[in-house]
């Protein structure tokens, strides 16, 4: 038999809270940690089922003993009544006969009333011991699971009632209810303990010497932050009609066999790391919301700010994305350069040209220059393929400018804005 690593044994003991011998026994039998854990959890579930069956059998035995004792008492009472009713006075005693007649006359109506009252049942103001036993038996019958049978002539199938009170889900909710009540009663004590633990001293100190000449030694705190226990977190689990949900996460359906492991872990007081998104050894507080009579409702999407990419408005061609923005610390060469004051301005008018690549330029020219001159200037300064066709357009309203010998004044382009667009 291969030797089992100590790390595996310690991990099994931490997950199951068992002794070292039991951990070694399971790991030696199965060899793998996961298989050993599954076998241990299955045995624990079987033990719980056996204990429930034993408790149910004990209740049935107690009920049978009570019914037997009640029937014995009833028969004894009937015998005593017949014996008392059979008593008669001596023939020679008048006093005894008178007392007998008086007793008979005073007590004869009462048994009639009592018999009618006990026969009706609903009109009785008192409950007998038999009524109590009968009511308890009815309650026990209601608590028992109802199983039905289905099938044909040669085959049969036993179907268990899904509303079994001993089911895993009901057991889990009942434990959560009891745990919530205990937490409410002991809540203040836990808060005080937490505050006392938070005020503990941490840091470094001085070690006192044993001799007179011994120097003081500084002792550092070697406890790393990674080895300390993670902070306590809170998780919310909602149980719907179809399944259960952790916070606003996805729905874990009851009919999925993979999710039964999570229910079993929660029922045994352990927190599934993947389900609750916690670390190993981290303390977690689980708040349970019971909504078994409601269907699952998907969480509404939270409204937030805009995120993503967009298109720059006013691009030369609809649908064409604008070039990437230039960092602020860099000045592109294509940007418009302010003209120095000492440079003389040429021409009697100016036209602002907006190129398709985002560059802007202010062209000083004469009003007698032609539109064709403007096209040639844009072609030579566009820094693109000269063979690519384009058009010059008015800024507003947007309409193309004809490339002809019309003067800038006649084309109404004096002190205007011209936009370049690719053809």
Swiss-Prot record:
The modification Phosphothreonine is found at residue 331. Residues 46-66 have a biased composition (Basic and acidic residues). Keywords: Cytoplasm, Isopeptide bond, Nucleus, Phosphoprotein, Ubl conjugation, Ubl conjugation pathway. GO terms for biological process: ascospore formation; autophagosome assembly; ERAD pathway; glycogen metabolic process; Golgi organization; membrane fusion; nuclear membrane reassembly; piecemeal microautophagy of the nucleus. Residues 44-167, 299-348 are annotated as: Disordered. Residues 232-297 form the SEP domain. It is found in: Nucleus; Cytoplasm. Involved in CDC48-dependent protein degradation through the ubiquitin/proteasome pathway. Direct or indirect positive regulator of GLC7 activity. This is UBX domain-containing protein 1.
